[in-house]
């Protein structure tokens, strides 16, 4: 450039902003979190927002280790909802909680002790160490949750181990006692020999591939009821009732055989026969059993199950008799023989039959899972190992065994020790669900379940569930505040005793139960009888702990929302429902939202052995190899949460995170462009009124109204993936690829304060502020970063104080939108031809091109003619085809192929030609124009740029 050539660089309005192109999340996100904390943004909004209170009640995670990706999904979903509600002006109350008692924490403590330390362990020292472990874990997890950008009352979380919480829980228990819902009874429960404790349903898992030794056996029938055909009585002497079981070890506890009253049973002749010449089996199973047993079974006579009731048989291993009794719908012909071996001490259905017929509850198995003396020759043997084998051998020896075979099925395991459980009758404390089941089912129907199928799931579970065993034989938990008479074993549990213990626990915590004497724990009126009583040693099921959280946190209020994984239909949702309905007669929640589990990119469960675990900390901070696993920051993790359909199981992995980081960058770069081009814009004085805006800008406001209305609907319906898709589409398709692409010419080369530029800045300012608000629930750090870089003043310190998106009804213009959709479609067609010309090097930039255009529709042609003024200065400088297509010139043709050009696209009613633009290139705007060279003062500029320098374009 010679001295004589003017430099127009300083006359161009280039973007200016200190907003970084890169997020630098590792440093920037903690700075923004410190800003929120310093200015108490959450605390202030929680109190000063004008709207109603919104309570999302936190399901307490278990305080026994580092957080996994499922925790991140859960807590971020909650935070998205809470932040949206804050932006909508509601007073959000969110008090995070932790589940701090129970066996997993006990096990962690025990694992860290040497054998001699374990031998000397008292309940109080174990409890002290368990408490220390839980509190340390809570502190670590709290830090992680806060790093995710999750807001809440972190200074006052609820912990199930604090005295006020434990006292509230004792209060719930006491209310249930007084209403007659708590009882003590001998009943089969899921018993874990490996943990030596009873387990609730929620503490079981059913791994694939468990193989049991199943067997078919026959018990000798010695008496039949009257009214059967003669053939039945003729068979006595060598007649067996055939049963099938997958738990041979329960045969010593057999007291009955159950039939279905409505099924047809057959008396079959066995060929070849050994001990039994005849067997009783379900008629529909004769053929299948013939194959299984390897014998011919010939039907001799039939009878209904109801007709076999009260038949008597001899136990094959013990000197006692049993009866054929009526069972329930669980007796089917799907497997086995159609007759069910019944041991009331070892199964819930068996227990139900036993209760109906007044059978004793025989359970000859101790807490270690070994046979007791009641099992005679099997005493001392482990029922799941050598005890099982010994029973099978004994049945073989006495001729009762018909067949043994391996059986693969789902079997309950202890979720903590990963060892099999058994059903075993023990003295336990129960909540009688029967007493309030109907009320619970009515309460379920009044709740909004998201997704809707959650209602069917929990309804079926509550309708079918048995009474809830709430006692545990562990030290680390809330004590069941019961005293037992030393002589009679009678429990002492009254309103007075419970209230007294509750007051002590509120004051001193539950350690007091172990620290204080019986005399100190009894109320004044009973103190002189202290020698008669001893303290109970059972603690409450941890599901009763967390299920009482409504009492400790909500009091009489109902939460607006509970939100947890879909496994909580049988866990926390249910335990909370049952305790609240029992005490208050209503559900603790108005709505319940569930999410699926997190899988890897191939849809597999995560496991260390597969090496497919995504650690949320690594997503945020990066892995050991930061090139391979870069630090994406919390916002990218949160963007992932918004992108998945959480109603199902959701995938995550390196490829997914890379794609999300790319989407995040696009949103960030869009915001950076908007910020940079508003550096000299003051909304109060520079905004152009809606009526004076060019059509393109009014169309863009229509699109913003559509987009942000869709985002609002997405948040209102908890469909965050719709937010993700809509915002991504706005930033990429509507803004970057369309509006901002066209806007650069207006923003950079127009007169700085001219309407052509200010009208565009008006749209940018509206888009930017609403974009920041709309992404704030999901991308709070990015939204706040944008807000802190706004080049103009607003009344709000933080984006979260600015409220939700602000839209005007007048922006909606469907006719205008329809026209611009058609124009955008035309632009896409023109771009196809421009791409062809660019690929073959006719042009570099599209500004080097001229477009020739023919449309057959005469009305449309007239409209396009209005958008194609004769010269650069006679239109409005915005709503023109040359700007829409990003070319230097457009010529409308009276007919197709009226000009010979190198690049053409022909379609129905449409012809597009592209050639090189006419005239010279303007050094300032890079458009080609025949006006370049005509000005003596600015010979290198086009007429537009000359006018812009005069402040007229």
Curated annotation (Swiss-Prot):
E.C. code: 6.1.1.5
Record: residues binding Zn(2+):
922, 925, 942, 945
Where ATP binds, per the record, is at 608
- Keywords per UniProt: Aminoacyl-tRNA synthetase, ATP-binding, Cytoplasm, Ligase, Metal-binding, Nucleotide-binding, Protein biosynthesis, Zinc
Motif segment ('HIGH' region): 61-71
| Nucleotide-binding listed as a keyword | yes
Main localisation: cytoplasm
| Short sequence motif 'KMSKS' region: positions | 605-609
What subunit structure does UniProt give?
Answer: Monomer.
| Comment block on domains | IleRS has two distinct active sites: one for aminoacylation and one for editing. The misactivated valine is translocated from the active site to the editing site, which sterically excludes the correctly activated isoleucine. The single editing site contains two valyl binding pockets, one specific for each substrate (Val-AMP or Val-tRNA(Ile)).
Name the protein family.
Belongs to the class-I aminoacyl-tRNA synthetase family. IleS type 1 subfamily.
The protein here is known as Isoleucine--tRNA ligase
Q: Give the lineage.
A: Bacteria, Bacillati, Cyanobacteriota, Cyanophyceae, Acaryochloridales
Q: Encoded by which gene?
A: ileS
């Amino acid at each position: 450039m010679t001295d004589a050539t003017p430099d127009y660089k300083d006359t161009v309005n280039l973007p200016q902003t200190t907003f970084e192109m890169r997020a630098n999340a590792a440093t920037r996100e903690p700075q923004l979190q410190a800003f929120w904390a310093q200015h108490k943004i959450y605390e202030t909004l929680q109190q000063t927002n004008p709207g109603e209170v919104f309570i999302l009640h936190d399901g307490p995670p278990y305080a026994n280790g580092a957080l996994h990706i499922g925790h991140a999904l859960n807590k971020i979903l909650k935070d998205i909802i809470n932040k949206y509600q804050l932006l909508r002006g509601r007073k959000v109350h969110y008090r995070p909680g932790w589940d701090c008692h129970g066996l997993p924490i006990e096990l962690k403590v025990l694992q860290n002790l040497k054998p001699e330390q374990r031998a000397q362990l008292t309940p109080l020292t174990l409890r002290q160490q368990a408490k220390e472990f839980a509190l340390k874990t809570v502190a670590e997890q709290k830090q992680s949750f806060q790093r995710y950008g999750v807001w809440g009352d972190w200074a006052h979380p609820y912990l199930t181990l604090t005295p006020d919480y434990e006292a509230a829980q004792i209060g719930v228990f006491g209310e249930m006692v007084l209403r007659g819902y708590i009882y003590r009874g001998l009943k089969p429960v899921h018993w874990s020999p490996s943990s030596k404790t009873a387990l609730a349903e929620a503490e079981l898992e059913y791994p694939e591939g468990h193989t049991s030794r199943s067997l078919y056996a026959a018990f000798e029938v010695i008496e039949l009821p009257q009214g059967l055909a003669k053939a039945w009585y003729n068979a006595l002497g060598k007649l067996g009732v055939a049963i099938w079981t997958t738990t041979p070890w329960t045969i010593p506890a057999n007291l009955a055989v159950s039939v279905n009253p409505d099924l047809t049973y057959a008396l079959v002749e066995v060929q070849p026969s050994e001990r039994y010449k005849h067997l009783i089996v379900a008629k529909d199973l004769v053929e299948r059993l013939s194959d299984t047993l390897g014998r011919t079974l010939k039907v001799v006579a039939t009878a209904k199950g109801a007709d076999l009731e009260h038949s008597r048989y001899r136990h094959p291993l013990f000197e006692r008799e049993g009866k054929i009794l009526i069972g329930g719908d669980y007796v089917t012909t799907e497997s086995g023989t159609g007759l069910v071996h019944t041991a009331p001490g070892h199964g819930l259905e068996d227990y139900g039959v036993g209760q109906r017929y007044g059978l004793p509850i025989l359970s000859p198995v101790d807490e270690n899972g070994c046979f007791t003396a009641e099992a005679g020759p099997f005493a001392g043997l482990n029922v799941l190992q050598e005890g099982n084998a010994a029973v099978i051998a004994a049945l073989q020896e006495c001729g009762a065994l018909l067949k043994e075979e391996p059986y693969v099925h789902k079997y309950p395991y202890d979720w903590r020790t990963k060892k099999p459980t058994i059903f075993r009758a023990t003295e336990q404390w129960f909540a009688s669900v029967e007493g309030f089941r109907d009320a619970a089912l009515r309460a379920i129907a009044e709740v909004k379940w998201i997704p809707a199928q959650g209602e069917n799931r929990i309804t079926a579970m509550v309708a079918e569930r048995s009474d809830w065993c709430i006692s545990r034989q562990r030290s680390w938990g809330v004590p069941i505040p019961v005293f037992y008479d030393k002589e009679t074993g009678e429990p002492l549990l009254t309103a007075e005793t419970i209230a007294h213990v509750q007051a002590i626990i509120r004051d001193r915590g539950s350690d007091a139960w172990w620290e204080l004497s019986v005399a100190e724990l009894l109320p004044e009126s009973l103190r002189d009888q202290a020698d008669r009583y001893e303290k109970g040693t059972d603690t409450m099921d941890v599901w009763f702990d967390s299920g009482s959280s409504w009492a400790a946190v909500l009091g009489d209020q109902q939460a607006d929302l509970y939100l947890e994984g879909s496994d909580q239909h049988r866990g926390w949702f249910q335990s909370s429902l049952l305790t609240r309905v029992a005490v208050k007669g209503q559900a603790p929640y108005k709505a319940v939202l569930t999410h699926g589990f997190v899988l890897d990119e191939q849809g597999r469960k995560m496991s260390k052995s597969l090496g497919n675990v995504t650690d949320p900390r690594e997503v945020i901070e990066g892995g050991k190899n930061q090139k391979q696993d870069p630090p994406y920051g919390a916002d990218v993790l949160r963007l992932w949460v918004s992108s998945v359909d959480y109603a199902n199981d959701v995938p995550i992995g390196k490829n997914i995170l890379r794609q999300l980081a790319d989407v995040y960058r696009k949103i960030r770069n869009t915001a950076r462009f908007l910020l940079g081009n508003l550096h000299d814009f003051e909304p109060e004085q520079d905004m152009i009124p809606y009526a004076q805006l060019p059509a393109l800008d009014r169309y863009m406001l229509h699109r913003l109204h559509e987009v942000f209305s869709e985002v609002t609907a997405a948040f209102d319906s908890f469909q965050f993936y719709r937010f993700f898709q809509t915002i991504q589409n706005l930033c990429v398709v509507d803004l970057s690829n369309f509006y901002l692409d066209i806007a650069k010419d207006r923003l950079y080369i127009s007169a700085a304060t001219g309407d052509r530029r200010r009208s565009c800045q008006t749209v940018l300012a509206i888009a930017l502020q609403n974009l920041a608000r709309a992404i704030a629930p999901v991308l709070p750090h990015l939204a706040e970063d944008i807000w802190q870089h706004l080049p103009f003043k607003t009344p709000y310190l933080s984006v979260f104080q600015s409220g939700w998106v602000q839209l005007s009804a007048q922006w909606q213009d469907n006719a205008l939108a329809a026209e611009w959709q058609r124009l955008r479609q035309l632009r896409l067609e023109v771009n196809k031809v421009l791409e062809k010309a660019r690929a073959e090097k006719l042009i570099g930039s599209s500004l080097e091109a001229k477009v020739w255009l023919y449309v057959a529709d005469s009305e449309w042609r007239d409209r396009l003619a209005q958008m194609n003024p004769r010269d650069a200065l006679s239109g409005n400088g915005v709503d023109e085809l040359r700007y829409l297509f990003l070319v230097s010139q457009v010529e409308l043709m009276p007919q197709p192929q009226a000009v010979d050009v190198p690049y053409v696209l022909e379609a129905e009613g449409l012809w597009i030609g592209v050639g090189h633009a006419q005239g010279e290139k303007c050094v300032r705007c890079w458009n080609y124009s025949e006006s370049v060279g005509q000005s003596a003062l600015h010979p290198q500029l086009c007429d537009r740029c000359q006018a812009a320098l005069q402040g007229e374009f």
